[in-house]
Amino acid sequence: MRTDWVAKRKNDPIRTQMHYARKGIITEEMHYIAKRESISPELIRSEVARGRMIIPANVNHANLEPMCIGVASKCKINSNIGNSSVVSDIAGELEKLEYSVKYGADTVMDLSTGGDIPAIRKAIIGASPIPIGTVPIYEALSRVRRVEDLSAQVMLEVIEEQAEQGVDYMTIHAGILVQHIPLTTKRVTGIVSRGGSILAEWMVKNHKQNFLYECFEDICKILQKHDVSFSLGDGLRPGSIADASDAAQFAELKTLGELTQVAWKHDVQTMIEGPGHIPMDQIEMQVIKEKELCFEAPFYTLGPLVTDIAPGYDHITSAIGAAMIGWYGASMLCYVTPKEHLGLPNREDVKAGIIAYKIAAHAADIARHRPGVRDRDDALSRARYRFDWKEQFALSLDPETARSMHDETLPEDGFKDAHFCSMCGPKFCSMNISAKVESFTADDAAAVLSGAAPESLVNIE
C-alpha cells in the first residue's frame, strides 16, 4: 500500500509524519487514517503536529496499513508477542501475530528475548499489516556477556538495525536515571520493568548515568531517519498497588516529559508508557499527571491492574483499569493476558487478552462519545430483541465463542430462529414477553387508571 507514497518522498531530508504535519502537509497516511477514524484529515495533521497524536509508520514497513494513536482518535490496544530464552519458535510467534490481527489488536510488540531475535522480528514485520514495536535493549543484552558490558554503541547498532528492518516504534528506557534508583529501594516489588531493571543494574555496577539518557539525541537521529516513533519506557512503573504513584514513578515521568521535547525538536513522534498496578481511585490522577508533565503526548498504558490478588485472571483485573484509564484519556492500552506473572502466553492467552482489551477500549470510546462508536452496540441490541441469533453472532467481538456458547445447550439449527435461549426458555424470556406489550399505549395506560372496561383495552394473545 505505502510503497508509492514512501518512494515519492525518498529525497526529502526528513520524512517523519510529524515533520510533514508541522509543514502543513497532509500525507497519504493521514488521509487514509482520517477515513478509518471518521475524522477530518486536517484534524489528524494538527494533532500530529502538536505531538498529541502519532502515526507509527516506519518508511521501511511497506505492507503497513496506517493507523494513529492519540486522544482525538479511537482508543487503541496493543498485543505483546515474542519468545523467551526458554521457549523459542518462529512459527508459534507468527501464529500469535495472526491471532492478534484476527481479533483486533491495533499494534503488536515483539518482545523476544531468546533464539534468533532478528529472524523472528523480520518474519513478524513481513507478515504484519499493523505497526510493530520492540524493546531494543533485549536484543542488545543478547549481544554481550554481562549486563555491565552494555554500551551506547551496542544499543545504537541494534536500534539502527531494527529501524532498517521496519520496526514502527521502539520502547526506549531513557528516563530512569541513577538518582532515581534509591527511590525504589523501599518498594514492595522493586523495579518490575525488564528494561528498567537491566539499566538500574548497569548504572549501579558501572557507577555511571543511564547511557540511553546520555545518547538520546543520537537515538533521535536514527529514529528520524526511518520515521520510527518513540515509546518512552516507564522503567520505574509500579509493579504492585502498594507502589503506585510513588516518588520513583513520577521522577521518571518528569524526565520522560523532558525527553519528549528533545524528540520533538528532531520531529520524532513520541508516546509515553504508563503503569502498571494502580488502584481505581488514582487512575484519573495518573492521566492528569502524564498530560501535565509530558505535554499531552499520547499515553500508552499497561493495564493498569487494579488489584494484585488474581493471578490467572489478570486480563480481567487489568481490563477494569484499562477501561477507566481509556475513559480518562489514555490513547493506547497494552493488553495483559491470563498468563501475566505466571508464564509465556500461548495463542489462546493472546486471544483472551485481546478480547478483554477490545472490550475495555470500546467501553472507553463509548464513554468519550466517539462519533459512531456505539452503532455496533445498537445494531447488536436490535438483533437481540428480534432474536436474530445469526446477526448477534456476526456483530459480536468473538463470533465463534458466542455461537459455541449458544450451541452448547441448543445446537440444532431450528433454535437459531427460537425466541428464547436456554437461560430462560420460552416461558420466562423477558424480551419475548416485552414484545407482547409493545402495542400498549399511553392512552391504554390512562384507561386502566380510569377504570375502563377490560374489553376496551389492547388484547394480548
From Swiss-Prot:
Alphabetic keyword roster: 4Fe-4S, Iron, Iron-sulfur, Lyase, Metal-binding, S-adenosyl-L-methionine, Thiamine biosynthesis, Zinc
GO-annotated molecular function: 4 iron, 4 sulfur cluster binding; carbon-carbon lyase activity; zinc ion binding
Residues annotated as binding Zn(2+): H277, H341
Pathway the protein contributes to: Cofactor biosynthesis; thiamine diphosphate biosynthesis
Catalyzed reactions: 5-amino-1-(5-phospho-beta-D-ribosyl)imidazole + S-adenosyl-L-methionine = 4-amino-2-methyl-5-(phosphooxymethyl)pyrimidine + CO + 5'-deoxyadenosine + formate + L-methionine + 3 H(+)
GO cellular component: cytosol
Cofactor note as given: Binds 1 [4Fe-4S] cluster per subunit. The cluster is coordinated with 3 cysteines and an exchangeable S-adenosyl-L-methionine.
Family annotation (Gene3D superfamilies): 6.10.250.620, Radical SAM ThiC family, central domain
A biological process from GO: thiamine diphosphate biosynthetic process
UniProt keyword annotation of Zinc-finger present: no
EC number in record: 4.1.99.17
Binding site for substrate: N80, M109, Y138, H173, S193, R194, G195, D234, G235, L236, R237, E273, Y300
Listed cofactors: [4Fe-4S] cluster
PANTHER family: PHOSPHOMETHYLPYRIMIDINE SYNTHASE, CHLOROPLASTIC (PTHR30557:SF1), THIAMINE BIOSYNTHESIS PROTEIN THIC (PTHR30557)
Assigned protein family: Belongs to the ThiC family.
NCBIfam families registered for this protein in UniProt: PRK09284.1, PRK13352.1, thiC
Function: Catalyzes the synthesis of the hydroxymethylpyrimidine phosphate (HMP-P) moiety of thiamine from aminoimidazole ribotide (AIR) in a radical S-adenosyl-L-methionine (SAM)-dependent reaction.
Protein name as it appears in the record: Phosphomethylpyrimidine synthase
Species of the source: Solibacter usitatus (strain Ellin6076)
